[in-house]
């Protein structure tokens, strides 16, 4: 393959962007909590909010960007509204967030900047009453309202639902609620199950475990 052909192929791929080093929820299986504390502290300290100039370069080169943190949540980037304003309306972007800690006014501005080229994926694992069992400190009922607000602003909304033991009984209800509210329900069978007491308590029944090396994702109401 010639170099120019290689570059064009890479350009078509979606690259994941860990836009910040901040998150306000305390998910027990997150890298922030399962990694050596000194190592993760160094990683957080040595990182920060992605520079706008870097965002511009990524937008220029790639056809798609996926804002999804491994140690952060993109909406906590101090200038995330400016990040949204830099995105190319002729390309595609996805913002993955737990959704907590932002005002209605902030979301109205974010959705105004998003348009049809930005998909918002809200990590709500179960219905609002069960999601904070794993996503500790998540304001789940407020997140639910922001998901509905996004729909009212013609934003494409994905309800990203990681299946745990405490929410697998709500899946059928979630499918119906997604239809009613025009959400795309994305059921995620996770592979992140270390052999420890916390993970074993959260682990769902066998039918909801991924059989692959990566997470299994099934979408409804596309």
Task: Annotate each predicted stretch with a short phrase.
Residues 1-119, 133-134, 138-141, 153, ...:
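Conserved alpha-helical substructure of the radical SAM core
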Residues 6-7, 18, 33-34, 38-53, ...:
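Radical SAM enzyme [4Fe-4S]-AdoMet core and its adjacent flexible, acidic
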């Amino acid at each position: 393959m010639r170099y120019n052909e290689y570059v064009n192929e890479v350009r078509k791929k979606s690259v994941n962007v860990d836009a910040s080093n901040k998150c306000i929820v305390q998910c027990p299986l997150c890298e922030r909590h399962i990694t050596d504390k000194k190592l993760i502290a160094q990683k957080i300290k040595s990182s920060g909010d992605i520079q706008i100039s870097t965002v511009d370069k990524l937008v220029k080169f790639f056809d798609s960007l996926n804002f999804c943190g491994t140690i952060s949540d993109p909406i906590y980037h101090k200038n995330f509204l400016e990040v949204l304003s830099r995105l190319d309306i002729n390309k595609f972007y996805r913002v993955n967030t737990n959704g907590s800690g932002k005002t209605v006014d902030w979301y109205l501005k974010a959705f105004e900047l998003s348009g049809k080229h930005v998909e918002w994926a809200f990590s709500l694992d179960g219905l609002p009453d069960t999601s904070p069992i794993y996503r500790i400190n998540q304001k789940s009922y407020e997140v639910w309202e922001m998901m509905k607000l996004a729909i009212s602003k013609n934003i494409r909304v994905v309800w990203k639902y990681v299946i745990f033991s405490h929410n697998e009984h709500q899946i059928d209800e979630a499918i119906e609620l997604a239809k009613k509210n025009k959400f795309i329900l994305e059921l995620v069978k996770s592979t992140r199950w270390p052999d420890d007491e916390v993970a074993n308590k959260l682990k769902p029944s066998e039918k909801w475990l991924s059989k692959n090396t990566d997470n299994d994702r099934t979408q409804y109401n596309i």
